Amino acid sequence: IMGGPMGALDYDKYPGLKAEAKLARAAVASGKPILGVCLGHQIIATALGAQLRKGDAPEIGFAPIKRVDKHDFFSMWDKQLTVLHWHNDVVGLPAEGQLLSRSSSTKVQAFRLGSALGMQFHLEVCAAGRMAG
């Protein structure tokens, strides 16, 4: 599930968000891998019980995140990695979720819970402004 300009709980304006949350819960319940980036991270986290709120300030631009738990997905990273941020809302960690990374202003930058992986940041964009890879 990728990003978008809406809020993860804007069900009245974007009814498809509710269906995405339902699909996220079903994927985790059945052990199917699911990845969320930015808004997708927030949809998965809230679908799994995390709280959504406005951040203290928008987090926009390239800035570092810190890996807090060495996980298979992130084992190739240094302890700190500079990534693109583009969000106003933040989520808490779902119950039983494993915190993987944080930034100075966003406590939950990445988490894992069962088959779900959520990343608030945009790893698909590099500092040169093009798609990574």
State where each predicted segment sits:
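Catalytic nucleophile loop
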Residues: 27-51
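Short catalytic/ligand-binding loop motif for oxyanion handling, primarily in non-cytosolic enzymes
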Residues: 8-9, 43-46, 128
